[in-house]
Amino acid sequence: MVSEVREVTGRAIPLVGNDIDTDRIIPARYLKAITFDGLREGAFIDDRTALKGAHPFDQPQYQDANILIVNRNFGCGSSREHAPQALSKWGIQAVIGESFAEIFFGNCVAIGVPCVTADEAIVKQLQELVAANPQANVSINLETLQVQVGDFIAPISIGEGTRSTFITGAWDACGQLVANTEQVRVTAAKLPYVSWGKLAAS
């Protein structure tokens, strides 16, 4: 079955700062990994090491949070699909910020992690609300295009095509293949290069 993403709810991590690039999200040395499974430990590892426990990803009040609140131009720098994968392995299921680097945004879509935008003032208020109450419930609704933290509700944005991709589950290419197994078999049977061995034998 395809995985529709209509709403993401949970707790959030406020990560303040503009132009946080992919090398900070996951350093280049982690790109040697054969699979993405071990990338959790590398998420923001250099920043976390330098801050000696003061980084939001290390602070106890933000553990197990699944929404990331960032600022402007998040995910800029070199193109690496490992960056959203590292966030996903950490447990991040959605990101809200002022703006995102285009390739990072696309890589997030490919793994089912919506990146929604909001005005600078709204993002700042969201970060402050979560910092004041890390246990607050945060909801990102792709159907109503709203974010809610407690009594605070604000508009969010995401391209209509991308929004539709999440709501319908079209982002999930593997899920679509599984859901349409019979059609895949029928199509494959008609392809000459798939049945070449049978034709040669006959």
Curated annotation (Swiss-Prot):
Pathway the protein contributes to: Amino-acid biosynthesis; L-leucine biosynthesis; L-leucine from 3-methyl-2-oxobutanoate: step 2/4
Entry's EC annotation: 4.2.1.33
One Gene Ontology cellular component annotation held by this UniProt entry: 3-isopropylmalate dehydratase complex
InterPro entries: 3-IsopropMal_deHydase_ssu, Aconitase/3IPM_dehydase_swvl, AconitaseA/IPMdHydase_ssu_swvl, IPMI_Swivel, LeuD
Keyword Amino-acid biosynthesis: yes
Taxonomic superkingdom: Bacteria
GO MF annotation: an example: 3-isopropylmalate dehydratase activity
Catalysed transformations (reactions): (2R,3S)-3-isopropylmalate = (2S)-2-isopropylmalate
Keyword Lyase: yes
Keywords: Amino-acid biosynthesis, Branched-chain amino acid biosynthesis, Leucine biosynthesis, Lyase
SUPFAM superfamilies per UniProt: LeuD/IlvD-like
One of the GO BP terms on file: L-leucine biosynthetic process
Quaternary organization: Heterodimer of LeuC and LeuD.
Record-linked NCBIfam families: leuD, PRK01641.1
Function of the molecule: Catalyzes the isomerization between 2-isopropylmalate and 3-isopropylmalate, via the formation of 2-isopropylmaleate.
Family: Belongs to the LeuD family. LeuD type 1 subfamily.
Name of this protein: 3-isopropylmalate dehydratase small subunit
